[in-house]
A protein has these predicted regions:
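Short acidic-hydrophobic surface loop/beta-edge motif
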Residues: 2-3, 94-102, 168-172
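Catalytic metal-binding/acid-base residues of hydrolase active sites
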Residues: 16, 37-38, 68-70, 97, ...
Length: 184
């Protein structure tokens, strides 16, 4: 758990459809899922089940950042999924920033090109599915994400995707980079 501005934040990723087997600690004001909640969201019921489970978690803010297994966000059906989540009180962050009662959370995709003037200077948490290049990435990280972290200097960068480095942290300048994958 992370505490910022008296808000308690819990984050995870990579449940791959096993979310009901996963224990979320009590007491979080903000719960973040950094993607790969399902194995294949195009199959139907698995995604709906995740939305039901995630929306029922006892936190004021629920943030979802799609991963590479949330294929519908890449094939043009993301608006429908995002609407379903919004109706259940879940905020989908993709290349966006959300102020969660004084905790500023942002997300970028691994191939975003963001102009320097558009980089937020007050970002508390950056959430991505992919890791930054060279940081707990098993040689699969994103150079764009690394550059964004170096320029924006968030307090935390939370990501998943790489199961082999699940739970590990790395200090990158002022930023604590943490792999929040729950699958090893």
């Amino acid at each position: 758990m992370i505490i910022i501005n008296s808000s308690t934040i819990f984050a995870f990723s990579d449940t791959h459809g096993h979310h009901r087997d996963f224990k979320v600690p009590e007491g979080a004001d903000i719960i973040i899922c950094a993607g790969d909640a399902v194995e294949d969201d195009l199959k139907g019921g698995e995604y709906d089940d995740f939305i039901e489970w995630f929306s029922a978690l006892p936190a004021k803010w629920k943030i979802f950042v799609p991963g590479n297994h949330e294929l519908s966000f890449e094939v043009g059906k993301g608006d429908e999924k995002e609407k379903m989540m919004a109706e259940k009180g879940i905020t989908v962050l993709q290349d966006a920033v959300e102020d969660c009662d004084g905790v500023v959370i942002g997300s970028i995709s691994g191939n975003s090109i963001i102009a320097d003037e558009d980089i937020p200077k007050d970002l508390d948490i950056l959430v991505t599915h992919m890791p930054p290049y060279g940081i707990l990435d098993e040689e699969m990280g994103s150079l764009e994400i690394l550059n964004f972290v170096l320029k924006s200097k968030p307090k935390y960068h939370l990501f998943g995707h790489i199961h082999a480095t699940a739970g590990q942290e790395f200090q990158l300048g002022q930023t604590i980079c943490r792999n929040i994958s729950v699958t090893k």
